């Protein structure tokens, strides 16, 4: 029975907390929780606990917050729990080989893509930006590489034309616990069937940067619309007008050809702000000037029509 396994859980953000909650709700025996140290947050920079820590303390679980698992004394914290398996979900710390080898059944990880596609830090965003038709979660046996371990279980879900990173995150946060609980059952009863990753199919999901989210009008309208959805809700695609950053929350693609230079404003109406791109026209629907709330193109035109005069060029 998987509920008889002694489980260490290691995770930090809300995505991880949802997996911990599923384990506890389904009656699994979580003997200890590792999460990152409290971090300053908000305007007051007050130290705030991670969502995983909040949940673990609510449930009366032992919580450990080492800055690193490299020191011997921190590795001993893991060893002393005598776990059968360690479940790792968006923990954010490297697990040395000594830690990976401690649990009887090793360490398993929930990854937000269908490996070997999109190894790395930003699989959800990269799958959207690439225009993938589907994504999912992979439960894998961890090794010393970055998302290189044998695959134990996969669950797929389609990516719709309306999906943002936020909506896809929520979908995978529902799928992940399902796959995790199934995998734990298979590990417990000896039916797990590890499958090596095909190195020929590997792609890498590099960490996102705010500068990368700046709209590059030389790209096609299709690429830019995907980028806007991929970077929503963070770091948010943006453009610069009058020296001010303006976030773009939503846009649509107009397939019409245009001879105008990329970045040229073609029209500004209540239906949207149409801008020439490297191929096709991008119709900006929802924007957020610095210090303001997100608003429709029509509302922004009512207050800042001078920003969007047809023929002008956006940086």
Swiss-Prot record:
**Which EC class does it fall in?**
transferase
Give the range the annotation lists for the signal sequence.
Answer: none
Q: Which reaction does it catalyse?
A: L-methionyl-tRNA(fMet) + (6R)-10-formyltetrahydrofolate = N-formyl-L-methionyl-tRNA(fMet) + (6S)-5,6,7,8-tetrahydrofolate + H(+)
Which Gene Ontology cellular-component terms appear in the entry? cytosol
One family name in Pfam for this protein? Formyl_trans_N
Relate the protein's function as given in its record.
Answer: Attaches a formyl group to the free amino group of methionyl-tRNA(fMet). The formyl group appears to play a dual role in the initiator identity of N-formylmethionyl-tRNA by promoting its recognition by IF2 and preventing the misappropriation of this tRNA by the elongation apparatus.
Q: Which HAMAP family match?
A: Formyl_trans (MF_00182)
Stated name of the protein = Methionyl-tRNA formyltransferase
Source species of the chain: Salmonella gallinarum (strain 287/91 / NCTC 13346)
């Amino acid at each position: 029975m998987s509920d008889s396994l002694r489980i260490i859980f290691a995770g930090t953000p809300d995505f991880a907390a949802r997996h911990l909650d599923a384990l506890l709700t389904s009656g699994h025996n979580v003997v200890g929780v590792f999460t990152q140290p409290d971090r300053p947050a908000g305007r007051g920079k007050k130290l705030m606990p991670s969502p995983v820590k909040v949940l673990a303390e609510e449930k009366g679980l032992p919580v450990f917050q080492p800055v690193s698992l490299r020191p011997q004394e921190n590795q001993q914290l893991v060893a002393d729990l005598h776990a059968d398996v360690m479940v790792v979900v968006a923990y954010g710390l490297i697990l040395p080989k000594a830690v990976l080898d401690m649990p009887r059944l090793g360490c398993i990880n929930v990854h937000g893509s269908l490996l070997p596609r999109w190894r790395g830090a930003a699989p959800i965003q990269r799958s959207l930006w690439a225009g993938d038709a589907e994504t999912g979660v992979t439960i894998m046996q961890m090794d010393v590489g970055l998302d290189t371990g044998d695959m134990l279980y996969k669950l797929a879900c389609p990516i719709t034309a309306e999906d943002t990173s936020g909506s896809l995150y929520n979908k995978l946060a529902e799928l992940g616990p399902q796959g995790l609980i199934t995998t734990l059952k298979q590990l417990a009863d000896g039916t797990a069937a590890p499958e090596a990753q095909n190195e020929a199919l590997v792609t890498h999901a590099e960490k996102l940067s705010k500068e990368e989210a700046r709209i590059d009008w030389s790209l096609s309208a299709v690429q830019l619309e995907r980028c806007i959805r991929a970077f929503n809700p963070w770091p948010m695609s943006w453009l610069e007008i009058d020296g001010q950053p303006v976030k773009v929350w939503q846009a649509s693609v107009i397939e019409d050809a245009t001879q105008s230079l990329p970045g040229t404003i073609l029209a500004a109406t209540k239906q949207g702000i149409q801008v020439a791109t490297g191929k096709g026209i991008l119709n900006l629907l929802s924007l957020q000037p610095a210090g303001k709330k997100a608003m429709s193109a029509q509302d922004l035109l009512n207050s800042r029509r001078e920003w969007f005069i047809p023929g002008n060029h956006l940086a």
